[in-house]
Amino acid sequence: MLHLLYALALLLLLCGACAILAERFTLSPALLPLPVLSGAVVVLYLCGVAGFLRVGAVAVLLALAAVWVVGLVQYRPAGVAAAWKRAASVPGFTLFLGGAAFIWLLFCVQQPMFTQWDEFTAWGLAPKMVVERGAFYVADPVNLKASFTYPATSLITFLFQPFGPWAEWACLAAIDTLALACLAAASALPRERWAGGVLVFAAGFLLPFFFSATPTGSYAAQYVNAMADLPLAMLFGGTLCLYFAVGRRKIAYWLVALPLAVLTLTKDICFAYGLITAFLIGLDLWLAADEPCRKAFPKALLRAGALAVIVLAAFSSWGRYTAAVTPTADTAASVGSEGLSYGAVLVGGVKQLLGMGRTEKFAQIMAAMGSAFFTRRICLLGGGIMAVAAITMVAAAAWLAADRGAPRRRVLAAHLGFAFCFAALYLFHLILYNYNFSDLEGLALKDYDRYLAPYYQAWMLAMLCLLAHGARERLAQLAAGGAAAVIFAVFCWRGVPAAGFWSGADSLYTLRADVQNRADTMNTVLGWPDRVLVISQGDDATRWYYYRYELTAQVVNGFGGFYGRLGETQDRWDSDFMNLVESENWTLYDYKAVCVPDTLVAYMAEKDCDYILIDRADDYLQREFSPLFEGGLTNDMPATLYHFEGADAAVPFTLAAVAESGVE
């Protein structure tokens, strides 16, 4: 409940500041939630790099409160109330505030949890560690696998829970709040065009479902996950929509820099998305200017270049910070198992695109990428060709609704610029599939829809925004209504999930809850400096990753291969989880590590482990390993934590904690 009260108070503080700032600078209040939230994230980022993350949270709260104080002094309470009233009449602002409050209330009641593997390896683990430790996860010695994630989603989460205990549902609500702020910028229309604003907001909200390969009737996690896909799509599209609304004003133009910096800090690929955003803005400043293109070019180049510098600064600062606090080989900027630099990958990829030294793998992936654009489902209408066709129809309507001259050039430049950058991004992913994935994953185009759907979403959102802002008001409103109606109709026809953010999903959390209950018992004994080896016989990695996320300790990686004799480590390799077996031809488990009692003890000593957690045992552990453990082992034993007394102890593993559970 405290999380909810704090979040609602912060929303009230933020929206009040937006209303006052809108009054001061004569801007639409719907435009300001995105730059204000982004500004808060930037402040937290700078303070986090300096090692004072919670000080940054206090600074953000004081800054928002200061806006209220200045507003009350300058405009008097009656003036602030009038500013609130005017802000509430703007559809984008009201929908943002109401939608965000609804999400927080709903999630507080439903308590949704993480469900996807990547949330437990990085995207959910990282914000959890930031909230619990009050510092960036890369500066923390625990669970450093989260260090490859970028900090934006962790920081927006921390903004909404900087002082209290960690809550997964609050993380999910915070990310959705950022997404709604992006939609508010896209739907920032005056009161008299409220219908257009509502339609753009509603259509934009459905876009993550529209550009989705989720099977019909399944659970839709678009607004209930901590992955960076939703923030990436919304920030990319929302930043451009913000620019389309304020870009011609000298001071307000630089508001775009704040969400652009946050976009860059969202994911590694967002460096490319940030540069694409700067390019599209520069293209608009050049081709859609009121003055001749030749005269507009230098100014457009300078402004776009300045935004590109911001992107580069944000991207490089995170890389330098990560390298400084974790000076290991894993933090180097490299691609694939060969450790090639980004430059080498790009040069090699371009050469192969041009036919120079093209490998068979590259040729096969290139053919698969070409076919996937037409055949691989990326939206509710089908493949990428259908997505581009739908977006082009909206762009054509926006062009018709715009005035002749610069407004029409703006729509044309934006759409063609998006198309050009999409082609470049598509080729870039072709190169990544060749260099950054195994042969099997590359040829299968692993996560193809996840990588490209955010671009389609942002492209469509930008075109909807331009359509709603069309000067021919009646035509624009009718066309926007038609586009929103089509999106809604297709969603109802082919994409309505069986469950989503609006419904509970308790059946998805059964295994999570089981591991969580067991981990709670272990955490009464464990502390962050402790190192724990987790064994769960028959696991497919799911339970191991859950424990790695839940335990308040350092979970030690296991091994794969053969380690059946002391001193013979040449046939084993580093892994994460492991199933212990007695021979390499063991067929009971798909993932196995040959291990005997002596080598288990040796491995514990080698990895400096303090504890071993036997989550699930089997006949092999009961038969061969029981003498090592106090009280022995049984194949039906509850999850049990043992303290490692050392390799020379008569009984190396002594009882530390026992957890009961009815779920297996």
Map each language-model feature to its residues:
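Membrane-interface alpha helices of multi-pass inner-membrane proteins
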Residues: 43-48, 240, 252-268, 272-279
